[in-house]
């Protein structure tokens, strides 16, 4: 039986691990990130992949850095025939890449060579793409640059956010892996080199990318809001206070108002002018220190009115 070591960390990785188990491979170990403090109370929380592994009685390793010699030796002691990774979060050292007889393969959430890096799902929406997908490729010491083994496309709906697209890609990745691993073991694949000239990157989201710039077009802002939902969430300011924007709708609303101006207060939320004729109806918001709420609840309690401006530290007189 083929001995597999699986490496992954977040929710995206769980269906991938589960598929390997259900397909009957001998998963001899799981490598994941260390437990991290989570939430306001900073409770030490295990990664989702660790929880899944323990449910199946699979040994778990949690190295801070898998490149350290003693950590490499722990993985090699498991004698893997194949290493499979999915959103592990670390680049593997050469000693690990060269060890398994069937190599090391990675399940990546984009159509490589586009969107290499740690946040491909976010960027596919931020950039307004209509489709993305899964690529399974051999791992090399360079980020997401190995030869491609298999691909599948996944449509991005106009209403998708990072959460919904993540779930679709996670399922697609598990299915593609199930179809791909037997071919890798049998040697019946023809890996395709990536075209470096077409490579684009999706580095982890930075804080400045979360701030809404109302001078951008309505379409760009709409994509930014859904491309940061459910994490880390786009924000603006109102009366000097941060205001998270979870969801919006595009509204055709030609106006001479400055970008960021509240042009109307509706039952469903507030309509805000942008840098073009597509305004945004903000339908889910979260004022500082409060819970996420529907636009209608925000309107009832926020004392916001037409003419107010978002995105500046404006205090009402």
UniProtKB/Swiss-Prot annotation:
EC number(s) given by UniProt: 2.1.2.9
GO cellular component, one term: cytosol
Pfam family, one: Formyl_trans_C
Enzyme class: transferase
Catalytic activity: L-methionyl-tRNA(fMet) + (6R)-10-formyltetrahydrofolate = N-formyl-L-methionyl-tRNA(fMet) + (6S)-5,6,7,8-tetrahydrofolate + H(+)
Top-level taxon of origin: Bacteria
Keyword tags: Protein biosynthesis, Transferase
Biological processes per GO annotation: conversion of methionyl-tRNA to N-formyl-methionyl-tRNA
GO molecular function: methionyl-tRNA formyltransferase activity
Binding site for (6S)-5,6,7,8-tetrahydrofolate: 110-113
Residue ranges crossing the lipid bilayer per the database entry: none
UniProt cross-references to CDD domains, sorted A to Z: FMT_core_Met-tRNA-FMT_N, Met_tRNA_FMT_C
Family: Belongs to the Fmt family.
PANTHER family: METHIONYL-TRNA FORMYLTRANSFERASE, METHIONYL-TRNA FORMYLTRANSFERASE, MITOCHONDRIAL
Functional description taken from the UniProt entry: Attaches a formyl group to the free amino group of methionyl-tRNA(fMet). The formyl group appears to play a dual role in the initiator identity of N-formylmethionyl-tRNA by promoting its recognition by IF2 and preventing the misappropriation of this tRNA by the elongation apparatus.
Protein name per its UniProtKB record: Methionyl-tRNA formyltransferase
């Amino acid at each position: 039986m083929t001995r597999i070591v699986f490496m992954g960390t977040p929710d995206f990785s769980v269906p991938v691990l589960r598929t390997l188990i259900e397909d009957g491979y001998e998963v001899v170990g799981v490598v994941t990130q260390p437990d991290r403090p989570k939430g306001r109370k900073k409770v030490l929380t295990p990664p989702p992949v660790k929880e899944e592994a323990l449910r199946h009685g699979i040994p778990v390793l949690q190295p801070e850095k898998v490149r350290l010699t003693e950590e490499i030796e722990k993985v090699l002691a498991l004698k893997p025939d194949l290493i499979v990774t999915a959103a592990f979060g670390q680049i593997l050292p050469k000693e690990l890449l060269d060890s398994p007889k069937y190599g090391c393969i990675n399940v990546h959430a984009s159509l490589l060579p586009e969107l290499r890096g740690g946040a491909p799902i976010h960027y596919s929406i931020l950039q307004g793409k209509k489709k993305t997908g899964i690529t399974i490729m051999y791992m090399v010491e360079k980020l997401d640059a190995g030869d491609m083994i298999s691909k599948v496309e996944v449509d991005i709906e106009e209403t998708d956010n990072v959460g919904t697209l993540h779930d679709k890609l996670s399922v697609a990745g598990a299915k593609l892996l199930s179809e791909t691993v037997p071919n890798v073991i049998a040697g019946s694949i023809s890996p395709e080199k990536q075209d470096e000239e077409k490579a684009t990157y999706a580095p982890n989201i930075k804080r400045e990318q979360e701030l809404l710039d109302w001078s951008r077009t309505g379409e760009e802002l709409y994509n930014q809001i859904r491309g940061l939902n459910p994490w880390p969430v786009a924000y603006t300011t109102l009366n000097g206070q941060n205001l998270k924007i979870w969801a919006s709708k595009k509204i055709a609303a030609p106006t001479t108002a400055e970008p960021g101006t509240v042009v109307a207060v509706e039952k469903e939320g507030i309509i805000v002018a942008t840098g073009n004729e597509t305004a945004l109806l903000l339908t889910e918001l979260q004022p500082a220190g409060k819970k996420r709420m529907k636009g209608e609840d925000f309107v009832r309690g926020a004392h916001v009115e037409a003419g107010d401006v978002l995105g500046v530290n404006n205090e009402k007189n």
